Amino acid sequence: MTKHYPKLLLLILTTAFCACKQPSGQSSTALADYLKDSSAIPRTGGIQMIKINTPKGKFNIWTKKIGNNPKIKLLLLNGGPGCTHEYFECMESFLPAEGIEMIYYDQLGCGNSDNPKDTSMWELPRFVEEVEQVRQALKLDSTNFYLLGHSWGGILAMEYALKYQKNLKGLIISNMMSSCPDYGKYGEEVLAKQFDPKVLARIREIEAKKDFDNPEYMQLLMPNFYAKHICRFPVDQWPEPVNRSLGKLNHSLYVTMQGPSEFGIGGNLTNWDRKAQLKNITVPALSIGAQYDTMDPKHMQWMATQFKNGSYLYCPNGSHMAMYDDQLMYMNGLIKFIKGVDAGEKSVKL
């Protein structure tokens, strides 16, 4: 038997080496299927432009698919309102290795999509119908459609679920409370009190004069608010995808819906509140909260108790961009939730 030992050892080592090269949980066949692009020629690297109908005419919406999984398709709704899909790019370092198909989507007025430059179109009900038209064009349905909304995207995702949850398999609300008045209250009663009193007084003075274009306003907010509650890195070390997305912010869209102040909401979302309707969301739903967020993590935890099949993910080191500043907690929890729902779980312990 000894004369066959070198060949046997070589076979074992070769097999082990090949096995180690595969991403977690994926065989070579599964990986090939995930990476395969069967779209029509000429192929565009997963990009699909979708023409939507609106009360003001037809417009083009930009989407990009990464990967291929007929059972798990995650559509990403960016925040702002008015940011772009780009700050979600960190997910490419985690989700493809788990076989999760992810779909970027720039909402109307954002990024690579058309910008009608018409403030009358920045209304929540119209955005809900836009998401539904995008879903139809991408052929997503209740067997595979997971919807993740972050910040403003969370408002949009909740509204979509309340009207169209029959099309969903799973819902993820990331870093967004279910009430804008409660969000404003948290900002005033909790976050504002964490400021240096002199800094806060100067910010209040600028806001009272509605002098939001004053460079001093952002100079005060960046180190005292953004670096503590939006993304917990020194501002000069913020991740490039975050800077790129914020650099393309549609200010008209942002101010119309959010308002010019960073403390609470003063635009047409001011009175938005869906606390009483959360119980009507019956699909598996995950809420994600973070300790240092602009959103109250206790409210996010409460939301999970209101959904019929709710789960909660807490990011103890995270802020509003917890997918960056508490990245492993965020990504591992998100993946565990999606895979749990795919396996038939209604709520997932995280």
Regions found by a protein language model. Name each.
Residues 310-350:
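Catalytic active-site module of serine/aspartate enzymes centered on a nucleophile-bearing elbow/loop
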Residues 194, 201-279, 283:
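Alpha/beta-hydrolase
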Residues 59-60, 64-115:
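Conserved HGGG/HGGXW glycine-rich cap/lid loop of the alpha/beta-hydrolase fold
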Residues 143-186:
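Conserved hydrolase catalytic core segment
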Residues 37-60:
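N-terminal cap/lid segment of alpha/beta-hydrolase-fold proteins
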Residues 104-148, 152:
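Active-site loop/oxyanion-hole signature of alpha/beta-hydrolase fold enzymes
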